[in-house]
């Protein structure tokens, strides 16, 4: 059975928001410590923020401020369901081109969004950069080569506008993260793919051991290979000392 595609009515939008709250209650009952709303990378909350995907002309679209309403109402619903705003965070990705997302009014929209996020007193705001730092590193750019990436959007934009804890992500290296931290442009940093292929990532960074590159061909599906079988540094050294098998 299929249903014809249609624009959500305002009533249906509120029903979706309510489902977030119900999910939050189940999450808390299951014993989780908190919730991060994924408002980035072209997913539903991000689609409401974008002027190219959100063509509504009601309370949930038509202006930068109205386009922020869905995400803000979802966050309020999560806070109400959990009972503690410090257990709720949100991830955003201003200007990112991912999963078909395109935004033409980035600063106007995210200025309106962040001013409201300040009022919610969340645990944190996490962001993903709109450009791949790994790709940027291949360009002739002295700042990138020197490990300074924090001056690129949206590091300073978010730091200047958001009053709480800021978490940065996006193809980071230890050097890039440390320099951004030293510059005061973020408080915490996310290493997602690096952790997939380096179960001992913290120890590797502490000891300046080289990192194992992740095989993204297995990053989003497939069998069990590449899921949790990457060796630690110590295991790699032991394997090399043993030599080839057979």
What residues fall within each predicted segment?
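Flavin-dependent oxidoreductase catalytic cores
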Residues: 1-246
């Amino acid at each position: 059975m299929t249903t014809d595609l249609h624009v959500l009515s305002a009533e249906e939008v509120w029903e979706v928001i309510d489902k977030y709250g119900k999910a939050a209650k189940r999450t808390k009952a299951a014993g989780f410590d908190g919730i991060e709303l994924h408002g980035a990378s072209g997913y539903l909350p991000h689609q409401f923020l974008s002027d190219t995907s959100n063509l509504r002309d009601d309370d949930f679209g038509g202006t930068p401020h109205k386009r922020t309403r869905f995400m803000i109402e979802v966050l309020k619903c999560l806070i109400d369901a959990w009972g503690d705003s410090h257990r709720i965070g949100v991830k955003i990705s201003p200007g990112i081109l991912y999963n078909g997302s395109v935004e033409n009014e980035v600063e106007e929209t995210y200025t309106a969004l962040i001013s409201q996020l300040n009022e919610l007193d969340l645990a944190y705001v996490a962001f993903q950069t709109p450009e791949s730092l790994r790709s940027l590193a291949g360009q002739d750019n002295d700042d990138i080569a020197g490990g300074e990436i924090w001056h690129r959007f949206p590091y300073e934009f978010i730091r200047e506008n958001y009053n709480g804890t800021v978490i940065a992500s996006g193809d980071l290296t230890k050097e890039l993260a440390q320099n951004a931290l030293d510059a005061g442009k973020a408080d915490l940093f996310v290493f997602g793919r690096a952790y997939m292929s380096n179960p001992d990532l913290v120890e590797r960074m502490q000891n300046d051991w080289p990192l194992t590159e992740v095989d993204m061909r297995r990053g989003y599906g497939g069998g069990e290979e590449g899921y949790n079988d990457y060796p630690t540094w110590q295991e790699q050294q032991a394997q090399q000392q043993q030599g080839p098998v057979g």
